[in-house]
Regions:
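Residue-level detector of alpha-helical secondary structure
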Residues: 28, 32, 77, 110-113, ...
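A short, Lys/Arg-rich alpha-helix, primarily the initiator
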Residues: 2-45, 49
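DNA major-groove recognition helix of helix-turn-helix/homeodomain DNA-binding modules
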Residues: 69-87
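A short, basic/aromatic helix-end/turn motif that makes direct DNA contacts
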Residues: 48-52, 81
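Recognition helix of helix-turn-helix/homeodomain-like DNA-binding domains
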Residues: 51-67
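Conserved hydrophobic/aromatic packing and binding residues within compact polymer-binding modules
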Residues: 46-47, 57-60, 87
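Short, charged recognition helix plus adjacent turn
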Residues: 5-7, 88-120
Length: 120
């Protein structure tokens, strides 16, 4: 009898801490402000390095997206060093949320958002 091959150990999927979930609009506003911080001429190299569609990122930055782009925003936040996971909650909601890993990440996000709101 052959020995059964097993893959790497996979952690069970636990129930998410919903207090760490950001609404789509908050994540979008954060990303727009962070993109506006990139110096003139720096956005194209950023997009090329992270394999983002330049025109779509420009539209996101300027608030001209035709529809919500949660997967793009998820990738963009990760490229801006905001670790997150997409979360569909409530389950029948048309918008997704962005789950931060811990309270420290949430506090950092809130602090940076407060800075953006004060600057605008």
């Amino acid at each position: 009898m052959g020995e059964e091959k097993r893959g790497p150990e996979v952690a069970p999927l636990s129930f998410p801490d919903l207090s760490l979930a950001l609404p789509y609009q908050d994540a979008l506003l954060y990303a727009q402000n962070r993109l506006k911080m990139i110096a003139r001429g720096g956005l194209l190299p950023f997009c090329e390095a992270h394999k983002f569609p330049y025109t779509t990122i420009i539209n996101l930055k300027n608030g001209n997206l035709k529809k919500e782009e949660p997967r793009l925003l998820h990738r963009l936040l990760r490229s801006l060093d905001v670790q997150n996971e997409l979360l569909q909650f409530p389950p029948d909601s048309p918008s997704q949320r962005f789950l931060l890993p811990d309270g420290e990440a949430l506090a950092t996000f809130q602090l940076q958002m407060a800075y953006f709101k004060a600057a605008n």
